[in-house]
Amino acid sequence: PYDLFLQSVRAHLRLLTVDVFHPSVPREKWLDAQDPKHVAISLNGEPTLYSRLSEFLEICHNHGVSTFLVTNGSLPKVIENLDTLPTQLYVSVDAPNKEIFDRICKPKFDTGAFNKLEQTLELLPSLDTRTVCRHTLIKNESLGHHEDYARLDNIADPMFIEAKGYIYVGNSQNNHTIENMPSHPEILEFSDKLASLTGREVLSDRRESRVALIGREMIPVVLPEKKLDLPSDLGIAKPQNFHLPQV
């Protein structure tokens, strides 16, 4: 886990290898970016499959780095048994009920995947950390169904609910069309109704991202206390060549 953390920072630093004397590069921001403050554990598959996740989280925190863990909720026992919790735990609630969940998410190995998601949501009120339910909303598929979403959100009682419109990019284009993208006004309409059903309000929104944040109040992220510094000879990651598999 420690090597994974260091390699992540090295990869981050490689992205910052720019001409720092160029007038378009704010030197103060470039210097600040040399010492990362946040890490998102997402996008590379389901992170709760990593058997040493707690150790990785603790290493991040000891270096003063906050952790944002995104899970699909398929492994509630892992969440329950984490010795170290992330700074913020996102649970992807991508469908309002089992029927739509099975159609959209297409679980391959577990016919009870939606029940596992519900078990994860039941855990959230007992976790001493920031929690978020994230809804990625697909027009004509999972958008709407406010009562079903509210039932799940009320079980989880998260600090925040994030309503995000589906974006027609990547491999999802094989399963959806551009008509499945909700507009920002549609996201706001959904969020207003969901906020009312969950005793919350719309705290913020971003038109460019077609996203709204629902909650009771804005609560800033507090960085973990920094106990360890990065090695002085850390260096940067070597260049990598990645090739997408041919379809």
Where are the regions that the model predicts?
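Canonical Radical SAM [4Fe-4S] cluster-binding loop centered on the CxxxCxxC motif
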Residues: 1-4
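Conserved AdoMet/S-adenosylmethionine-binding subsite of the radical SAM
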Residues: 12-185, 189, 193
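Acidic carboxylate-rich catalytic motifs and surrounding loops in phosphoryl-/glycosyl-chemistry enzymes
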Residues: 135-138, 165, 200-217
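Radical SAM enzyme core and accessory elements
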Residues: 211-247
